[in-house]
Amino acid sequence: MKKFVSVMVGLCLFINKPIYRKNIKKKESEAMLLEVNGYTFEVELENNTSAEALKEYVSKEKRTLSLDDYGNFEKVGNLGITLPRNDETITTKEGDLILYLGNKLCLYYNQNTWDFTKLGHIKDTAHLKEALGKGSVQVTLLME
């Protein structure tokens, strides 16, 4: 009987003991958003140190940037910070968010091939060109 009671007490202690698991990543619920002229776009970030640094920068507070047309394929402006570069030759597509020279943010609405770092991509570009319009534009990056 003592053995049975000892087993039951041990079992009760085991059941009530919290179970800790190692290496379980918390699901990221944060999404980067880009707001421009009344439109909000969700940005899917790349898996690189540049995108991680941008996320950290924007997490501190939302960032509003002035972007200007360049080459009839992108809007470009100063980030206000230098991010790590992971440059490679890539061909952009509409909605790509690109780091150029480590301190410039480029938002592509047409194709271009060059050496730069991809930061992310706008998930739904259906109204992107309409939102960007012609000339200079104010763009706000924030974490949801």
Where are these regions (language model features)?
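Glycine-rich active-site loops that engage anionic ligands at enzyme catalytic sites
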Residues: 58-59, 63-144
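Sec-dependent N-terminal signal peptides of Gram-positive bacterial secreted proteins and lipoproteins
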Residues: 1-19
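N-terminal secretory signal peptides
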Residues: 29-72
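Phosphate-binding glycine-rich loops and adjacent basic patches that engage nucleotide phosphates
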Residues: 17-18, 39, 58, 102
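Generic secretory/membrane-interface signal
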Residues: 10-11, 27-29
